[in-house]
Swiss-Prot record:
<protein>
    <recommendedName>
        <fullName>Uncharacterized protein L723</fullName>
    </recommendedName>
</protein>
Length: 222
């Protein structure tokens, strides 16, 4: 680097004085290599796959339940952000992760999700109980943030669920891309890496209360 002289005007005197500064000569800059932990990147990839599967599974269950029990209100129940869908998402997600926690503590290897969790834990900097808690919260965050008003609910087409599924997948991919998974999956100071906590069979590990504005976001400038 070479020194340059910067001319500075002071007050109204137009007095000039020299001040030393530094610039980089040429176009060659040395940048440090990316320092993202490759294990964390692998964990991010596995978590993306896992959460996508969980959300799509629950959406399929909800879709067929609505079509079976409340077909006349399908468009409202599936394509509107309202209390029923938010409550259903929370219930399905809590039930899934609570059952998974118990299956994991029993080392139920017949459960494919348990094996998946074991693989993810091998890339994490914390224990399975912390990972499960993170997965639970991330799944809830992403699922309830889907803009349901942009989902296609049309029972007049040849394959209505496929059309719904495709529009849902587009929404889900957008949310996964915008969600900072690397930050969410990194070990925080609050992540107590104690031993896995064994809980009674009738005990729910996960619970959550959602306070979410309902309805499609509007442009405040309109």
């Amino acid at each position: 680097m070479s020194k340059i002289t910067e001319i500075v005007d002071i007050d109204n005197d137009e007095e000039e004085y020299a001040k030393q500064a530094y610039i980089v000569e040429g176009d060659d800059l040395d940048f440090p290599r990316a320092t993202i932990n490759p294990k964390l990147q692998k964990l991010q990839s596995l978590v993306t796959e896992f959460i996508t599967s969980v959300i799509l599974k629950h959406e399929k269950e909800y879709y067929h339940l609505v079509l079976k029990m409340y077909k006349e209100n399908a468009e409202y129940l599936l394509g509107t952000t309202q209390n029923t869908i938010i409550s259903t998402i929370c219930t399905l997600t809590k039930t899934f992760y609570n059952k998974l926690y118990h299956s994991f503590q029993k080392n139920d290897l017949n459960n494919g999700s348990v094996k998946f969790i074991q693989e993810m834990v091998s890339y994490a900097d914390y224990g399975p109980h912390i990972l499960l808690d993170k997965l639970f919260r991330i799944t809830i965050d992403i699922h309830i943030d889907i803009i349901r008003e942009e989902l296609i609910v049309d029972e007049t087409v040849e394959k209505p669920f496929d059309v719904y599924y495709d529009s849902l997948s587009i929404q889900l991919n957008k949310k996964l891309v915008s969600y900072n998974l690397l930050n969410a999956l990194s070990k925080n100071d609050d992540d107590n890496d104690s031993q896995f906590v064994i809980v009674p069979d009738n005990h729910e590990v996960f619970d959550i209360n959602i306070d979410k504005p309902l309805g499609k976001p509007t442009n405040q400038n309109q």
